[in-house]
Amino acid sequence: MILESVAEHLLFKNDINYQNVFSILSDILEKKIDYSDIYFQSIIHESWILENSIIKEGTYNINQGVGVRIVLGDKTSFSYSNDITFNSLISSSKLAMSILDVKAITKNVCPLTTTRTKPIYTSCNPLTSIDTQKKLEILNRINCVAKNYDHRVVSVNAELSSSYDEVLIATSDGNLAADIRPLIRLSINVLVNDKGKFERGVSGGGSRSGYSFFLNKHKSGKILAEYYACEAARIALINLSAQEAPSGTFPVVLGSGWPGVLLHEAVGHGLEGDFNRQGTSVFANKIGRQVASELCTIVDDGTLKDRRGSLTIDDEGTPGQYNILIKNGILKKYLQDKTNARLMEMDLTGNGRRESYAHLPLPRMTNTYMLSGPFNPKEIICSIDYGIYALNFSGGQVDITSGKFVFSTSEAYLIKQGKIGKSIKNVTLIGSGIDVMKEISMVGNDLKIDEGVGICVKNGQSIPVGVGQPTIKLNNLTVGGTI
């Protein structure tokens, strides 16, 4: 069982037992507080890097520790140590209590009750799932496939990485839960040159599984690693012949899958509980109101099998959930961690996430996507006389308070008379999340989740996430210059 395995590694081997953990929480609850938790973690990470056809770097590191958090009202004290021992646990708890400077009160900790949630991903260690030689063969194979894709490919860089993360959480409300989280990621960057003109293409994928995932067959007939290599080369070559994008206000079609990153940034962050409790989100105090086209239903789903953003439990011990955030255009709920849910008197959603034991949990997304609609993607393209088809994105920025965003594409095309035309580059999409959501007039029936490379940063904390959507049509969106 997961709990027993993790407890053996994180507690028992360090001469800590359940009663020790219970006693620390009991000591903390002698003070006038609302909540406390103890978060144990051990994570192993490796990375292999190929640069210019040579495997130049291999890294391996282990990081482990324990964090103690105490919450009173909207105030939090936190202390952590990279030494998992009973003495360091005592020291961390005393330091956390001294930071908050709370008064004594008689209060008993709830008996620790184990939370056993059915795992939604394997507990295998990806670092040992295949031997080192096979890992290097994957990188060399990527290099060979990309170089052979076209004579204009001049450089191939790739990174193959994985981690094996074990966590155990004990809480003052009596919850004891553990999780084992494998994670793999492959990123490929291809540079092409045609008579002194250079362009780049990026592709990749990942999963909560072992490295053999990259050896699975893609629908194209290639193994996934080869498919990603070809995709990176294809995108780079397309941009070689791409013309400059027009500027103005146009109908815009966003492709399925990774373009959901715009949804993640421009809408998802604005639905996180802390921003709404503080009144800094454009979506604050709008539950029950229409915030998007009635064609839009947006969910945050931590329960998708093997997906990068999925969580059997979040970093507060709450089981991962399927949350409908916006239904038929109506705002239904915010994403919550325990602190913000308590202060807002709302239900937990399984979105309390942290980068590591050395960080505080925050309300964060898992896999955020829009559900499919009734339209065939070809119908959507055919409905536009002149517009933009944005198929892949390279980056962007968003202001949570206003909801305004700026995004740049890595693959885009003109649409003329209902047909996809020439490729265009330096496409910048500018708008406001809440306004753009109301501009959606067609939603495709081709929902796709991204390939598994998403990384989200908030308050300096990086976590893995998933994004997705079907093909969608925006009636009007501003298209400008480069970021």
Curated annotation (Swiss-Prot):
User: What is the protein named?
Assistant: Metalloprotease TldD homolog
Q: List the record's Gene Ontology CC terms alphabetically.
A: cytosol
Role, per record: Probable metalloprotease.
Name its GO BP terms in alphabetical order.
proteolysis
rRNA processing found in the keyword field? no
Q: What is its EC number?
A: 3.4.-.-
Which interval of the chain is the signal sequence? none
Uppermost EC category: hydrolase
**Pfam families in UniProt:** PmbA_TldD_1st (PF01523), PmbA_TldD_2nd (PF19290), PmbA_TldD_3rd (PF19289)
Q: State the encoding gene.
A: tldD
Lineage, opening ranks = Bacteria, Pseudomonadati, Pseudomonadota, Gammaproteobacteria, Enterobacterales
Q: Which family does it belong to?
A: Belongs to the peptidase U62 family.
Drop me one GO molecular function for this one.
metallopeptidase activity
InterPro entries registered for this protein in UniProt: Metalloprtase-TldD/E_C, Metalloprtase-TldD/E_cen_dom, Metalloprtase-TldD/E_N, Peptidase_U62_metallo, TldD, TldD/PmbA_N, TldD/PmbA_sf
| Keywords on record | Hydrolase, Metalloprotease, Protease
Alphabetical list of Gene3D superfamilies matching this protein: PmbA/TldD superfamily
